[in-house]
């Protein structure tokens, strides 16, 4: 027995034509694949807004020569240790580092961690990417 369900939807011609162009540009094999992704994205937005369980990555670049920055980064990560699964540290050059922090937990808490890191002087760029944890 299949877990897939079929259903029909009605859309205006302009909307479906625009959607078909999007599907082609993104390289989807079918409308169904594209719709599944859109539904997942919307459900993730809802989960995040409601403070649900999410997983993701915080990716940041920073200047490790900035005074006390490395110690502040470590302190903040320890303050949120229950959310952090792992970290990967990459030396980009003599001054710049890339850090990838894998996270899992309550969406608002992960956003607090991300914000606490982002505002530190010496952090050049930070991006938070979240996904469903289930």
From Swiss-Prot:
Record carries keyword Transcription regulation: yes
One GO term of the biological process aspect: response to nickel cation
Function: Transcriptional regulator.
Xref: InterPro entries: Acetolactate_synth/TF_NikR_C (IPR027271), ACT-like_dom_sf (IPR045865), Arc_rbn_hlx_hlx (IPR013321), CopG (IPR002145), CopG/NikR_regulator (IPR050192), Ni_resp_reg_NikR (IPR022988), Ribbon_hlx_hlx (IPR010985), TF_NikR_Ni-bd_C (IPR014864)
NCBIfam families: PRK00630.1 (NF001884), PRK01002.1 (NF002169), PRK02967.1 (NF002815), PRK04460.1 (NF003381)
Entry similarity comment: Belongs to the transcriptional regulatory CopG/NikR family.
Cofactor binding summary note: Binds 1 nickel ion per subunit.
UniProt: Ni(2+) binding residues: 78, 89, 91, 97
Protein name: Putative nickel-responsive regulator
Keywords assigned: DNA-binding, Metal-binding, Nickel, Transcription, Transcription regulation
SUPFAM superfamilies: ACT-like, Ribbon-helix-helix
MF term (GO), any: DNA-binding transcription factor activity
Cofactors required: Ni(2+)
């Amino acid at each position: 027995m299949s877990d897939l369900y079929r259903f029909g939807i009605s859309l205006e011609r302009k909307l479906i034509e625009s959607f078909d162009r999007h599907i082609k540009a993104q390289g989807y094999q079918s409308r169904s694949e594209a719709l599944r992704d859109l539904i997942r994205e919307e459900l993730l937005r809802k989960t995040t807004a409601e403070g649900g369980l999410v997983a993701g990555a915080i990716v940041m670049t920073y200047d490790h020569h900035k005074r006390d920055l490395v110690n502040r980064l470590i302190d903040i990560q320890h303050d949120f240790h229950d959310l952090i699964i792992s970290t990967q540290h990459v030396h980009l050059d003599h001054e710049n580092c890339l850090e990838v922090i894998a996270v899992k937990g309550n969406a608002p808490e992960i956003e607090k961690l991300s914000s606490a890191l982002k505002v530190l002087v010496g952090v050049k760029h930070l991006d938070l990417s979240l996904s469903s944890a289930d």
